[in-house]
Amino acid sequence: MKLIIFTGLVLFAIVSLIEAQAENEKACLPQYQVCTDAPGNCSSNLVCDCYGRYKSGARIGRNCFCLQKGVIYKREN
């Protein structure tokens, strides 16, 4: 009986550890990947940067990408 209880507790501990580790290791998005629906999922050295899309002065949407922190992107003509 003690062996069954001990085995159950050990299995419970192992499953809990696996679940906690999976949460800590959530998949992060690499550079230039779209993060519109998941702004917090960019890799640690990246930030989710969003830009509005406009057509004839009216906003038609928003795009977000994982970009390097501290880097300023400028439009080229």
Swiss-Prot record:
Pfam families listed in its UniProt record: Toxin_35
Subcellular location: Secreted
Predominant localisation class: secreted
Tissue distribution of the protein: Expressed by the venom gland.
MF annotations from Gene Ontology: toxin activity
Position of the signal peptide: 1-20
InterPro entries with a match to the protein in the record: Spider_toxin_CSTX_knottin (IPR019553)
Post-translational modification: Contains 4 disulfide bonds.
Entry keyword annotation includes Nucleus: no
Cellular-component GO terms for this entry: extracellular region
Keyword terms, alphabetized: Disulfide bond, Secreted, Signal, Toxin
Prodomain positions: 21-26
Taxonomic superkingdom: Eukaryota
Keyword presence, Signal: yes
Family the UniProt entry places it in: Belongs to the neurotoxin 19 (CSTX) family. 08 (U8-Lctx) subfamily.
Name of the protein in its database record: U8-lycotoxin-Ls1c
Biological source species: Lycosa singoriensis (Wolf spider)
